[in-house]
């Protein structure tokens, strides 16, 4: 017997990230964030490797990162618009969770599955934040993939990389719905083919099930 959770299905059918420009103060308290983190880290994790770790970025830290981003962009001669956009992400944030993928040596669990698990944490944190009543979004930006910047600013090791930064604030307005995938274009149905052999082991026919 199946047990249908209509409320959960409705949430998943209508969920969407909140654009940063629609969010304002306040951000979740530490106790409120712990609830989100507990829910957000319940993700597929083959081998129980926990190939990720989290850093909570509170406002003073985000301001410090914004300064580091500005300095770094200027050091590599970025255009002003590129620098401004990179800095703004951190300046505007009130509370962020840095999700760091941590590759673990494993003979059974390939690296790509560990990457998927870290990505699952990002989505799960967004969903947990939304379910808790907060505005949440998953932002990364090119700086988060710049090895020099993340090593110096976030203290990442050589086996680590940024999966995403999840921001939480208060929602001011519900965003308009956007186009969603057309299932008819992306889904194919494959049925099992049952082969029937004759006495000489040649295929006599197959039955589509």
Task: Tell me the role of every PLM-derived stretch.
Residues 60-64, 70-71, 103-105, 148, ...:
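Short, charged/polar surface micro-motifs in flexible loops or helix N-caps
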Residues 69-76, 108-112, 152-154:
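Short, surface-exposed loop/helix-turn segments at secondary-structure junctions
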Residues 87-89, 152-179:
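A glycine-rich helix N-cap at a beta->alpha junction
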Residues 40, 97, 103-150:
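Small-aliphatic-rich amphipathic alpha-helix that forms the alpha element of a beta-alpha
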Residues 176-209:
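Phosphate/diphosphate-binding glycine-rich loops and adjacent basic-rich segments that engage nucleotide
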Residues 89-101:
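Ordered, amphipathic secondary-structure segments that act as subunit-interaction surfaces
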Residues 1-92, 198-209:
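N-terminal amphipathic, basic helical "cap/leader" segment at the start of enzyme domains
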């Amino acid at each position: 017997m199946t047990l249908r959770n209509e409320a959960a299905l409705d949430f998943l059918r209508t969920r969407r990230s909140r654009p940063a420009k629609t969010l304002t103060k306040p951000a979740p308290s530490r106790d409120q964030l712990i609830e989100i983190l507990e829910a957000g880290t319940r993700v597929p994790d083959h081998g129980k490797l926990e190939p990720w770790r989290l850093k909570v970025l509170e406002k003073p830290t985000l301001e410090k990162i914004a300064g580091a981003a500005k300095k770094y962009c200027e050091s590599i001669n970025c255009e002003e618009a590129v620098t401004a956009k990179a800095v703004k992400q951190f300046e505007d944030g009130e509370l962020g969770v840095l999700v760091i993928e941590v590759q673990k040596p494993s003979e059974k669990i390939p690296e790509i599955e560990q990457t998927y698990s870290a990505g699952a944490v990002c989505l799960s944190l967004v969903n947990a934040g939304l379910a808790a009543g907060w505005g949440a979004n998953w932002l990364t930006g090119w700086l988060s993939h710049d090895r020099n910047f993340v090593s110096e600013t976030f203290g990442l090791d050589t086996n680590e990389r940024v999966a995403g930064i999840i921001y939480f604030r208060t929602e001011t307005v519900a965003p308009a719905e956007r186009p969603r995938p057309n299932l008819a274009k992306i889904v194919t149905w494959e049925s099992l083919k049952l082969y029937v052999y004759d006495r000489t082991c040649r295929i006599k026919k197959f039955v589509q099930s």
